[in-house]
């Protein structure tokens, strides 16, 4: 959709997944460390928990992709599933629908990776990397013959898209790497906020319209992209620290409850021993 809503919709999807990954990835790293300290039964419970989370995530990805395709195709000015009718019909909407299609395929790969043992390890990351590559490939040929600022602001998005595709592809070969996972989180959030920025620049909700040919605006937008990256890094850092400190607090509380229980049992044992000694003295 060539309007603000058309950019806010994918921006919201990427923001939600980026924020979710920023919480899930450090949480998963902490639980992985605990796996080495627990028995087989607890390890099986953690594996089942991870699989359930991944299954829900894949299902949500499929749902969001379906919503995106329906929104692109069946808005009032959309193509309504007509590709050619005396000429090409709304090719921009078709390109966006194709982008959502590959994210839906990525969601299917997520579900299959969890529900079937015959699926190769890393297939979920491979298809996510492919979906990101297709998005960047489509957007690269999406911006020709446009005003300079329009081309520039979309080309900046490609850094986040292709960067995310490359880092996710590396996860196929270096599974459960903390740095690569956090990089994926950062670039997903950057994509989400930058989609909103594109919408505000090209389709401002209020105030004067941007001059799409002025070089100063191009310079500002380039600097603004760096600010978005800094904010994305800050958000991921806050989420990581929040999960880490919450885990530490829960561990301290659990340890305190165990110590209190031990003290109670010790005091109960000592009081019962005293009672037995008193009874024996009386006898």
Curated annotation (Swiss-Prot):
InterPro entries attached to this UniProt entry: DUF716 (IPR006904), TMEM45 (IPR042127)
Keywords, in A-Z order: Membrane, Transmembrane, Transmembrane helix
Compositionally biased region (Polar residues): 264-275
Record has Membrane as a keyword: yes
Organism superkingdom: Eukaryota
Any one of the GO CC terms: membrane
Record's subcellular location: Membrane
UniProt xrefs under Pfam families: DUF716
Main subcellular location of this protein, as a coarse class: membrane
UniProt keyword Zinc, yes or no: no
Topology within the bilayer: Multi-pass membrane protein
Region Disordered, residue ranges: 261-283
Annotated TM spans: 7-27, 55-75, 99-119, 121-141, 153-173, 187-207, 218-238
Family from the record: Belongs to the TMEM45 family.
Protein name: Transmembrane protein 45B
Species, as recorded: Danio rerio (Zebrafish)
UniProt gene name: tmem45b
């Amino acid at each position: 959709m060539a309007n603000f809503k058309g950019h806010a919709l994918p921006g919201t999807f990427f923001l939600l997944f980026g924020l979710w990954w920023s919480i899930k990835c450090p949480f998963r790293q902490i639980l992985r460390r605990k796996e080495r300290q627990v028995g087989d039964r607890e390890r099986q419970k953690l594996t089942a928990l991870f699989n359930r989370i991944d299954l829900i995530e894949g299902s949500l990805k499929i749902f969001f992709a379906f919503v995106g395709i329906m929104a692109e195709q069946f808005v009032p000015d959309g193509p309504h599933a007509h590709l050619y009718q005396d000429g090409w019909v709304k090719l921009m909407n078709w390109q966006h629908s194709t982008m959502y299609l590959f994210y839906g395929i990525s969601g299917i790969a997520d579900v299959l990776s969890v529900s079937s043992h015959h699926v190769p390890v890393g297939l979920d990351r491979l298809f996510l990397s492919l979906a990101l590559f297709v998005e960047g490939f489509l957007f690269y040929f999406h911006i020709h013959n446009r005003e300079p600022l329009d081309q520039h602001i979309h080309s900046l998005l490609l850094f986040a898209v292709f960067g995310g595709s490359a880092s996710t592809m590396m996860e196929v070969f270096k599974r459960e790497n903390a740095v690569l996972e956090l990089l994926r989180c950062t670039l997903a959030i950057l994509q989400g906020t930058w989609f909103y920025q594109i919408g505000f620049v090209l389709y401002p909700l209020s105030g004067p319209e941007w001059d799409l040919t002025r070089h100063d605006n191009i310079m500002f937008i380039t600097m603004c992209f760096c600010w978005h990256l800094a904010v994305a890094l800050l958000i991921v850092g806050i989420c990581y620290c929040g999960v880490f400190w919450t885990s530490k607090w829960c561990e301290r509380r659990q340890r305190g409850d165990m110590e209190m229980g031990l003290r109670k049992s010790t005091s109960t044992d000592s009081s019962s021993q005293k009672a037995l000694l008193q009874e024996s003295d009386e006898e």
